[in-house]
């Protein structure tokens, strides 16, 4: 099977945007092969909907049906490129999100900012004697591990204690540095990601939830680069969250699987 794809680099979170139409039942297997065999070393794979660049609401489906903010940003940049450039913003549809995602494009600086789904809940779990906050989001949950060095062993224990979800992230946080480890159920993959958009949002939302009304800005240094988040609080609740940073797009490539 010959697969056409676009390599994308949203803040180091290497992503394959697959142009070849692949049925939902085959996506997990195709994605696993691409992550194992493509020379770019992809951390995740998204599948572009048919005639997406011409659609009123372009569609991207992630490999396990999960939500991904970085892939959303990269996909919006690709749609803009296919349309000839010049868009300042556009709406896209992506798996794991119940509503369209608005993306602001800053082509002059090579950046894109996605208006992210607001987390839907917070719970605490107990893991190895410590209390761990888990932020529930559409299509993915994130466990936040403050003052904790990255640890595969600890992540495994956290995953066992988390409720089932399409994707589960464990965010290891040291000051303003965040290291994401993400599990996707459909593909069975566990990846130390270079950056994680939804994890960035989860942490920013968690930090902002008790702050005064108004807009609060956060920036986290992740292995592949810096991601920014802006949380607008109104009447004690998060009303709007925007996440973004750099995006680089490559040219179309092919691989035989």
Segments predicted by a language model, with ranges:
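A glycine-rich beta-to-alpha transition motif near the start of alpha/beta enzyme domains, typified by
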Residues: 1-111, 119-121, 131-136, 141-257
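Acyltransferase
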Residues: 123-126
């Amino acid at each position: 099977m010959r697969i056409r794809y676009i390599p994308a680099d949203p803040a180091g979170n290497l992503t394959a945007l697959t142009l070849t139409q692949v049925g939902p039942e085959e996506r997990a297997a195709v994605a696993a092969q691409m992550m194992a065999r493509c020379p770019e070393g992809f951390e995740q794979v998204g599948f572009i909907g048919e005639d997406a660049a011409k659609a009123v609401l372009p569609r991207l489906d992630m490999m396990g049906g999960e939500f991904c903010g970085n892939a959303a940003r990269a996909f919006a940049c690709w749609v803009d490129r296919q349309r000839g450039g010049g868009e300042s913003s556009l709406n896209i549809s992506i798996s794991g999100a119940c509503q369209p995602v608005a993306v602001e494009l800053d082509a002059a600086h090579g950046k894109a900012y996605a208006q992210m789904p607001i987390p839907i809940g917070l719970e605490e779990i107990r893991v190895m004697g410590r209390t761990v906050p888990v932020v529930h989001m559409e299509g993915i949950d994130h466990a936040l591990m403050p003052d904790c060095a990255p640890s595969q062993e600890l992540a495994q224990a956290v995953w066992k204690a988390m409720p089932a979800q399409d994707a589960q992230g464990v965010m290891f946080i040291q000051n303003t540095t965040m290291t994401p480890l993400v599990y996707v159920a459909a593909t069975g993959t566990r990846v130390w990601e270079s950056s994680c958009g939804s994890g960035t949002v989860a942490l920013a939302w968690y930090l902002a939830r008790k702050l005064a009304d108004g807009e609060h800005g956060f920036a986290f240094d992740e292995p592949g680069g810096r991601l920014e988040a802006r949380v607008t609080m109104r009447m004690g609740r998060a009303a709007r969250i925007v996440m973004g940073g750099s995006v680089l797009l490559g040219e179309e490539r092919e691989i035989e699987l």
